[in-house]
Design a protein with these regions (language model features):
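A solvent-exposed interaction/effector surface
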Residues: 1-130
């Protein structure tokens, strides 16, 4: 969607402002690139109106004590147990459908994750608070 693409273009063009705050793995690589989501109330509940209305934050996973520089926002996502699926066209709807069939409730907003090493995208469906 155009709005998300604009957010990512903006985040990527200013990444140098937060690169030093990014969480790193043992090899010094960035741990994760996230499209974090929340409901409008910012309580990290699922998007409303058939998953069409909510907030989206394009960014990088940062060290816990990071303070967002000017122009950036820090979200601290609650801890959940997730169902994780590789992100392909139609996977969101397919996974929600399968969860409904299996009686599994979505307890928070779904997040986009991009593995910086492989470039593969994943969807994280929160199913239980931890």
């Amino acid at each position: 969607d155009v709005y998300k693409r604009q957010l990512w273009d903006d985040a990527n063009s200013h990444f140098s402002e937060v690169a030093h705050l990014a969480k790193k793995d043992a090899n010094g690589g960035i741990v994760g690139i996230w499209g974090a989501m929340s409901d409008i109330s910012r309580s990290f509940k699922p998007w409303e109106d058939g998953f069409s209305k909510g907030l989206y934050l394009a960014g990088v996973e940062c060290v816990d004590n990071a303070e967002a520089p000017d122009g950036w926002i820090k979200w601290t996502i609650p801890s959940y147990e997730y169902i994780v699926v590789e992100n392909h066209k139609g996977m969101f709807e397919e996974t929600i459908g399968q969860m409904n069939e299996d009686g599994i409730s979505l307890v928070g907003a779904v997040h986009d994750y991009t593995d910086p090493v492989t470039g593969k995208g994943y969807l994280y469906f929160p199913i239980r608070e931890v």
